[in-house]
Amino acid sequence: MRSDEIKKGFQRAPHRSLLRATGLKDEDFEKPFIGVANSFIEIIPGHFFLNKYAAIIKDEIRKCGCVPFEFNTIGVDDGIAMGHDGMLYSLPSREIIANSIETVMNAHKLDALICIPNCDKITPGMIMGALRVNVPTIFVSGGPMKAGKLSDGTPIDLATAFEAVGKVAKGEMSEEELYQIECEACPSGGSCSGMFTANSMNTLMEAMGIALKGNGTILALTPEREELLRKAARRICEIAKDEKLTQEYKIRNILNEKAIHNAFVVDMAMGGSTNTVLHMMAISKEAGVDFPLSKLNEISKHVAHIAKISPSLQTVHMEDINKAGGVSAVMKEASKRSDTVLYLDNPVIEGGTIGDRIKDAEVIDTSIIHPIDKPYSEVGGLAILFGNLAEEGAVVKTAGIDPNMREFTGKAICFDSQQEAIDGILGGKVKPGHVVVIRYEGPKGGPGMQEMLAPTSLIAGMNLGDKVALITDGRFSGATRGASIGHVSPEAAEGGVIGLLQDGDEIYINVDTYTLEVKLSDEELEERRKNFKPKVKDIKGRWLRQYRSLVTNAANGAVLKDEC
């Protein structure tokens, strides 16, 4: 066992002495040590109950004859951090989480790992850390919350609340109506109920085989979710107690190139958050897999978009997907298309393969998960755009775009920060036909690559979603919809063309040809570059300054450089 390094032999008597202080007995030194990486934090709705989940898991681990050691990571709630400088810390928190997993697991030589993530950057951070350690690992998330409901039965969620702010600003909704939405949008614990970043990533973990069947859709705080916790605990112990299984089920043996491909197939079929692209690029690097951004468009061409979930379809939420058959049903239905490549032979953590897992799955409600011959779209719900404005790529959630906006030409109106853009939108500067440009919000420029949910929600709430596009070197919340193009690389802070744009420049967007261009000649761009000096923001936070000096761009997953 890996843990023998801290518990076997006379030289480890001091180590055992310390472990005895935690309650261990002689017999415990013969058992596998299981890390339980929790992300319990009281301020996040998807995490405030995870201490109870960890207790269930630890109890089951003990019953199975192993020794659990719980430790915690930090967490940032993107919704609460939204709209102020707290959002600068969201993406950087992913790196702290990954580092904490690597640190605790390697410092204490634990044999195997269960991770309990749920929201935002916590899930990808835990995956990245687990890949570095490369021991058998099972992920079991906290689960999605129920959708809210208005008094008339209309389903709502957090995206409804953000967009309602725009309606109030435009005078189309009263503050009393906004208050009703505020009180009903998030009715229970869990990750926000739509196909936002948290649920997108929890779904993709299931698709990759590192989480058990049902992980992406079984609601939080239900008996079914608690049984999933117990199953995960039993399985990790079964693996850790068998040396052959321990070698076979190291996380890198499961989360390989085929698993990443399968994740993107599901992402396309369900129209996941654009943040999944950023995180999966980072995960692929940690897994040692070369997976270029351009490959996503090739996948998209051969995957039908068969499930629309809020924010793309505001009446459908994760609980509906669960009732309709869950992620396995989506995968099985998607695989029926002859040109869709889904690697059914790839292993899953419970044993067997993806093919074994989805063999008996079926779509129970075809109004929620569409038949393969009646998709929402013949192509996937995400696209990577290229052109002189995004030489290394930009990301758009095509599932959330009005059909009239799939090809769009508009005049640039430029803002050098998210707050400038918010002020401009609320001040009436943004008109139909504009392309809102928000720059210096990339990984380096922000620093921290803020989510632009406030501006996109204001645009949607002010009924400009089919008349205005937005491009940014920042990123978006999973709750964003509309012609919102993010992750523009290179970013302004590293000299990208987005930094050269001026008000009135003509910008051309075509999601069907994967194009993002400014209608300027190479000569004009080169002339502008002669006098261009990227802005550098005055940042007070020491961690943010360190992050800015180390982070790579969005096309590389915004991972940190190995060396300065």
Curated annotation (Swiss-Prot):
Q: Which UniProt keywords apply?
A: 2Fe-2S, Amino-acid biosynthesis, Branched-chain amino acid biosynthesis, Iron, Iron-sulfur, Lyase, Magnesium, Metal-binding
> Iron as a keyword?
yes
Q: Its catalytic activity?
A: (2R)-2,3-dihydroxy-3-methylbutanoate = 3-methyl-2-oxobutanoate + H2O; (2R,3R)-2,3-dihydroxy-3-methylpentanoate = (S)-3-methyl-2-oxopentanoate + H2O
What terms describe the molecular function in GO for this protein?
A: 2 iron, 2 sulfur cluster binding; dihydroxy-acid dehydratase activity; magnesium ion binding
Q: Any binding details for the cofactor? A: Binds 1 [2Fe-2S] cluster per subunit. This cluster acts as a Lewis acid cofactor.
As recorded in UniProt, its EC number(s) are 4.2.1.9
Q: Which residues bind [2Fe-2S] cluster?
A: C119, C192
Q: Which GO terms describe its biological process?
A: isoleucine biosynthetic process; L-valine biosynthetic process
Question: For the modification N6-carboxylysine, which residues carry it?
Answer: K121
Active site annotation, chain numbering: S477 (proton acceptor)
- The record's top EC class is lyase
* Cofactors required: [2Fe-2S] cluster; Mg(2+)
Classify the source by domain of life.
Bacteria
Q: Where does Mg(2+) bind?
A: D78, D120, K121, E451
What are the record's GO terms for cellular component? cytosol
Per the record, the pathway is: Amino-acid biosynthesis; L-isoleucine biosynthesis; L-isoleucine from 2-oxobutanoate: step 3/4; Amino-acid biosynthesis; L-valine biosynthesis; L-valine from pyruvate: step 3/4
Output the HAMAP family linked to this UniProt entry.
IlvD (MF_00012)
Task of the protein: Functions in the biosynthesis of branched-chain amino acids. Catalyzes the dehydration of (2R,3R)-2,3-dihydroxy-3-methylpentanoate (2,3-dihydroxy-3-methylvalerate) into 2-oxo-3-methylpentanoate (2-oxo-3-methylvalerate) and of (2R)-2,3-dihydroxy-3-methylbutanoate (2,3-dihydroxyisovalerate) into 2-oxo-3-methylbutanoate (2-oxoisovalerate), the penultimate precursor to L-isoleucine and L-valine, respectively.
The family line of this record is: Belongs to the IlvD/Edd family.
Q: What is this protein called?
A: Dihydroxy-acid dehydratase
